[in-house]
Amino acid sequence: MAQKPKVDPHVGRLGYLQALVTEFQETQSQDAKEQVLANLANFAYDPSNYEYLRQLQVLDLFLDSLSEENETLVEFAIGGLCNLCPDRANKEHILHAGGVPLIINCLSSPNEETVLSAITTLMHLSPPGRSFLPELTATPVVQCMLRFSLSASARLRNLAQIFLEDFCSPRQVAEARSRQAHSALGIPLPRSVAPRQR
């Protein structure tokens, strides 16, 4: 288990966040990386940290972590992005950094928490209405949402249904249904996991 970064108490929040980022970049321990990324994702929940997190390029750290093979790192990274993206500046950074395809890739994760955060992040990146990015509602994404809307998990099923109703046109849903009927889409539904004990 990673130790708390050694931070001068007079350095404050920015110093503490900088120590976390430095520890993430320097440690070789996967457990330490997971713990640090979880901490950063939790700090991303507080809007008073947004400016510090942008300054320390934590959004890019989260985006880079979406490509990791370690599912836990991916879960915490998408959770951090989900916490950050309601803010306009953070949303613009994610969009301009090419984050949408990385987030869409998270829809195929076997981890339900990762998928839920990915769907929520996509929803935050595109407000309801017809002025959203086409890639957010591309046919493969809509097909995923159709599959998720049939999930045994109420959270996944309900979130997918909201996405389909609020972010997709009836034409997009009909087209995705039509294509899905003619394809062998084999992406398994994510598995539910019990909440982690910390």
Curated annotation (Swiss-Prot):
Domain of life from the UniProt record: Eukaryota
ARM repeats: 57-99, 100-140
Keywords, ordered alphabetically: mRNA processing, mRNA splicing, Phosphoprotein, Repeat, Spliceosome
Residues modified as Phosphoserine: 169
InterPro entries reported for this sequence: ARM-like, ARM-type_fold, Armadillo, ARMC7
GO cellular component terms listed in the entry, alphabetical order: spliceosomal complex
GO biological process: one example: RNA splicing
One Pfam family, short name: Arm
SMART domains for this protein: ARM
Disulfide bridge positions per record: none
Oligomeric and partner information: Component of the minor spliceosome. Within this complex, interacts with RBM48.
Function: As a component of the minor spliceosome, involved in the splicing of U12-type introns in pre-mRNAs.
Protein name: Armadillo repeat-containing protein 7
Originating species: Homo sapiens
